[in-house]
């Protein structure tokens, strides 16, 4: 083939290659945005999905009365750190494999340290199965720990998972964390392998979807009047504190 023919062929295919590159870049961008939104949490997109009205559009994060009705009430069945009769409830929908949840975990702990008995922390399961395949097994493991050893063991287990997700999200790691939380190894293994609490995990997830949660962490601040504020994503402690103070002063 002559040099002129090669040049002509190259010129002919250059626009095609350029178009293909643009299309590929577009789809990569869409995929990245979707994954990022899922992990960053909150209720972004809830209005479009007709899950819980326009929760994401609530001014200053405060929900309307109709929106608040969609958030499942806190009960004795919940995993609660503190008293469910505290002035403030922090209800978090979370995923044990989510890196943003790992980032938010110490932020929530800091709130409990500062506000003491004024606040309680409620943890609910919201595994993002499509991108976090170890989140649901970890949630099932946590429920096993709670059933076998109680609430304190559950929170110790959760703290361990979020202290080192890479280490503890394997089957062996979950077992190690369970034993360190006070559960007998054989008892845990029997419960975990039976996938005993999958329906409980799913019920938490469905409740979150009804409330408008589409990603993790997605949290609500609730005061004694039943007023609620949305806390979308792994917000800073300063942002969380501002919402708590607003709820206390309302």
Which ranges hold each PLM region?
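C-terminal cap of thioredoxin/glutaredoxin-like
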Residues: 2-43, 175-250
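A short beta-strand-turn-helix
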Residues: 71-88, 113
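Extracytoplasmic/periplasmic mature domains of Sec-exported, cell-envelope-associated bacterial proteins
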Residues: 62-71, 77, 134-137, 239-242
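Structural alpha/beta surface segment adjacent to cysteine/selenocysteine redox centers
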Residues: 86, 91-96, 102-179, 211-214
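A generic local structural motif
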Residues: 75-78, 107-108, 205-206
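N-terminal, intrinsically disordered, polar/charged segments of Gram-positive cell-envelope systems
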Residues: 38-72
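Short clusters of hydrophobic/aromatic residues that line enzyme substrate/ligand-binding pockets
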Residues: 80-81, 168, 231
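Conserved strand-loop elements at the edges of beta-sheets that form or border functional pockets
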Residues: 83, 92, 233
């Amino acid at each position: 083939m002559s040099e002129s023919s090669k040049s002509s062929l190259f010129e002919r295919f250059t626009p095609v290659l350029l178009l293909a590159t643009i299309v590929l870049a577009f789809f990569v961008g869409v995929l990245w945005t979707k994954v990022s939104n899922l992990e960053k949490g909150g209720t972004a997109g809830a209005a479009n999905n007709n899950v819980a009205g326009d929760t994401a559009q609530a001014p200053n994060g405060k929900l309307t009365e109709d929106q608040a009705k969609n958030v499942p009430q806190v009960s004795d069945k919940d995993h609660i750190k503190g008293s469910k009769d505290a002035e403030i409830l922090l209800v978090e929908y979370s995923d044990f494999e989510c890196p943003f949840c790992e980032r938010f975990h110490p932020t929530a702990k800091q709130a409990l340290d500062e506000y003491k008995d004024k606040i309680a922390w409620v943890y609910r399961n919201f595994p993002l199965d499509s991108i976090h395949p170890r989140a649901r097994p970890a949630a099932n493991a946590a429920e096993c720990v709670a059933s076998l050893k109680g609430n304190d063991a559950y929170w110790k287990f959760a703290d361990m998972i979020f202290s080192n997700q890479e280490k503890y999200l394997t089957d062996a790691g979950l077992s190690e964390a369970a034993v360190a939380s006070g559960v007998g190894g054989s008892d845990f293994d029997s419960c975990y392998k039976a996938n005993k609490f999958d329906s409980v995990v799913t019920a938490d997830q469905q409740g979150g979807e009804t409330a408008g949660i589409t990603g993790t962490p997605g949290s609500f601040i609730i005061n004694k009047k039943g007023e609620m504020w949305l806390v979308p994503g792994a917000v800073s402690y300063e942002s969380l504190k501002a919402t708590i103070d607003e709820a206390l002063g309302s």
